């Protein structure tokens, strides 16, 4: 009997459901959508809806919705999207503390039922939640991946392509640091099919693109009026899973646990990584000028301040 690859998605909201649909079409593995008891219908309904699209799209992926965490058993990858969004009147500290508890409990359950899996974290604030999952699960650092960098870089590349009226496929650029206002798009490493972006766009316009990238999530929230982005975040997670299952050795920005890289230790935030079958197989340190390095340290400090507000055992 052939062992089919298994992907469990904890949280069947917009992002989790969209990711399940993408993965099903790509036939990367069988899928389990996990939700809370009170949201059983959402998990099972979305799973069935995706399953029923199989004859049209032409895929044979198994998609199962459940409220039983034990159904993640023997998963190869577990994606953690569970958590609450920031509500009106809620402080950032309250959001962090609430989601930290959710992620901590979930990571312990993953360690129990899927001890050999790779965990991909999307719950916000994602840098600190990735650190929480790392500490709570006890997994080796290469099997804990936070994802924001692919999303942030995709936004950055999109805005550059729009400004230049060129194909987004020809825009290459990386975004490092924390997911938020302190993220660092590497302008000096941004090229359009080999041509440095600084040769094509004014410094003022580049600064505007960088600022728009940093506010990219908030821009979507404002436009939607309710909820947040989910198509692009789900696609970013898909790209990571594809790199793992196909051992592609992709150079992708990921949130990783650092032990001295970029002058940072005991922290998780976005850096260039090689993603393959083992998860994060290598962290790549790129050359930076002094200004970029100082901005990255500022970003690390911002992430550390949130992390230090929590108590880790």
UniProtKB/Swiss-Prot annotation:
Keyword hit for Oxidoreductase: yes
Record-listed NAD(+) binding positions: 11-16, 99, 122-124
EC number(s) from the headed UniProt entry: 1.1.1.37
Catalytic activity: (S)-malate + NAD(+) = oxaloacetate + NADH + H(+)
Annotated GO biological process: lactate metabolic process; tricarboxylic acid cycle
Database matches in InterPro entries: L-lactate/malate_DH (IPR001557), Lactate/malate_DH_C (IPR022383), Lactate/malate_DH_N (IPR001236), Lactate_DH/Glyco_Ohase_4_C (IPR015955), Malate_DH_type3 (IPR011275), NAD(P)-bd_dom_sf (IPR036291)
Residues given in the record as substrate binding sites: 86, 92, 124, 155
Source organism, top-level taxon: Bacteria
Keywords on record: NAD, Oxidoreductase, Tricarboxylic acid cycle
Gene3D superfamilies given in the database record: Lactate dehydrogenase/glycoside hydrolase, family 4, C-terminal, NAD(P)-binding Rossmann-like Domain
Family, similarity comment: Belongs to the LDH/MDH superfamily. MDH type 3 family.
Function: Catalyzes the reversible oxidation of malate to oxaloacetate.
Official protein name in the record: Malate dehydrogenase
Biological source species: Staphylococcus epidermidis (strain ATCC 35984 / DSM 28319 / BCRC 17069 / CCUG 31568 / BM 3577 / RP62A)
Gene: mdh
């Amino acid at each position: 009997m052939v062992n089919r690859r298994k992907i469990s998605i904890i949280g069947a909201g917009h992002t989790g459901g969209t990711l399940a649909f993408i993965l099903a079409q790509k036939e990367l593995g069988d899928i389990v959508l996990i939700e809370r008891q009170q949201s059983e219908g959402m998990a099972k309904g979305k799973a069935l809806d995706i399953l029923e699209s199989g004859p049209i799209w032409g895929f044979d992926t198994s998609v199962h919705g459940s409220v039983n965490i034990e159904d993640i058993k023997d998963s190869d990858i577990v994606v953690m999207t569970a958590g609450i969004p920031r509500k009106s009147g809620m402080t950032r500290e309250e959001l962090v503390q609430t989601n930290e508890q959710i992620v901590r409990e979930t990571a312990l359950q993953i360690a129990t039922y899927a001890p050999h899996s790779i965990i991909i974290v999307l719950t916000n604030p994602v840098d600190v939640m990735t650190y929480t999952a790392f500490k709570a699960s006890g997994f080796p650092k290469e099997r804990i991946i936070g994802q924001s960098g692919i999303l942030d870089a995709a936004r950055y590349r999109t805005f550059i392509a729009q400004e230049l009226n060129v194909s987004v496929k020809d825009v290459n650029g990386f975004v490092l640091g924390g997911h938020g206002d302190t993220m660092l798009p590497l302008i000096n490493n941004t090229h359009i099919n080999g041509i440095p972006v600084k040769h094509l766009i004014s410094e003022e316009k580049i600064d505007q693109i960088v600022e728009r990238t940093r506010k990219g999530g908030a821009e979507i929230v404002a436009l939607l009026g309710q909820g947040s982005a989910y198509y692009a975040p789900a696609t970013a997670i898909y790209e990571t899973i594809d790199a793992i299952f196909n051992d592609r050795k992709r150079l992708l920005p990921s949130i990783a646990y650092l032990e001295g890289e970029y002058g940072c230790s005991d922290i998780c935030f976005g850096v260039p990584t090689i993603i393959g079958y083992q998860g994060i197989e290598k962290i790549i340190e790129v050359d930076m000028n002094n200004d970029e390095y100082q901005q990255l340290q500022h970003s690390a400090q911002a992430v550390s301040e949130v992390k230090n507000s929590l108590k880790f055992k």
